[in-house]
């Protein structure tokens, strides 16, 4: 299961463990934003991933890129990225070939982080069943390592934006014991990574969002 992850992502993992620098070509960690069909705004908040990478560069010993990559599921480059991120407010649609390819990516060592930006929850849950029809999204307990991989969140994912007044929720799908999808709902974590003038979040709220984002990336690269 982990062979592809070992061979394709080894530069990133070595970077995370021994602190490679820009002198090591090809070792930089870059998050790929997933461009999906269905009409949802997959491109939402273009500053979020570059800002998260900047934060991580200051607080980890990882060698990091400065910008996001944009990848579609059927792109050959999909398997070059250890972590794929998706967000949006609207509908997602996966064709059968896309669902099969995303399953292959995830079961070969890849990791998907999805953050509902208020409006994609129902669609996301429907489409994920195409990828893993026999798996259910399971709520992640606060004790899970993803909440403690670099910073500690004793009560799970932080609440960044209020919508319907519910508590922040975190879910996962596991394949052969490994979390392959991490999904946050009613949290808006990635909104907290946006430029300060976009949502006018207080500094302490943005800090928590960046810290949780760092946890997600560190966990994805080390599990």
Language-model region placement:
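Positively charged n-region of N-terminal signal peptides that target proteins for export
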Residues: 1-6
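An acidic, glycine-rich "communication" segment
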Residues: 28, 38-39, 47-48, 121-197, ...
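Alpha-helical scaffolding within the catalytic cores
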Residues: 66-73, 95-101, 165-169
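Short alpha-beta junction capping motif
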Residues: 31, 83-122
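Surface-exposed patches in mature extracellular/periplasmic domains of secreted proteins
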Residues: 62-72, 114-117, 135-143
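Aromatic-Pro/Gly-enriched surface loop or interdomain linker
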Residues: 20-83, 87-90, 180, 188-189, ...
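Bacterial N-terminal signal peptides
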Residues: 7-16
């Amino acid at each position: 299961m982990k062979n592809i992850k070992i061979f394709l992502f080894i530069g990133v993992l070595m970077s995370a463990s021994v602190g490679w620098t820009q002198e090591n070509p090809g070792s930089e960690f870059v998050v790929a934003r997933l461009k999906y069909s269905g009409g949802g705004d997959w491109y939402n908040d273009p500053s979020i991933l570059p800002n998260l990478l900047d934060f991580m560069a200051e607080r980890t010993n990882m060698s990091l890129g400065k910008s996001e990559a944009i990848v579609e599921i059927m792109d050959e480059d999909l398997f070059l990225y250890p972590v794929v991120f998706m967000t949006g407010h609207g509908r997602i649609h996966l064709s059968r070939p896309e669902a099969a390819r995303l399953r292959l990516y995830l079961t070969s060592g890849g990791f998907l982080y999805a953050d509902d930006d208020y409006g994609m929850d129902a669609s996301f849950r429907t489409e994920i069943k195409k990828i893993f029809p026999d798996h259910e999204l399971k709520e992640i307990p606060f004790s899970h390592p993803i909440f403690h991989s670099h910073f500690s969140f004793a009560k799970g994912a932080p609440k960044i934006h209020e919508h319907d007044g519910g508590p922040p929720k975190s879910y996962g799908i596991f394949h052969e014991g490994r979390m392959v999808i991490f999904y946050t709902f009613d949290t808006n974590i990635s909104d907290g990574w946006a430029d300060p003038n976009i949502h006018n979040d207080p500094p302490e709220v943005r800090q928590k969002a960046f810290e949780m984002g760092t946890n997600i990336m560190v966990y994805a690269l080390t599990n």
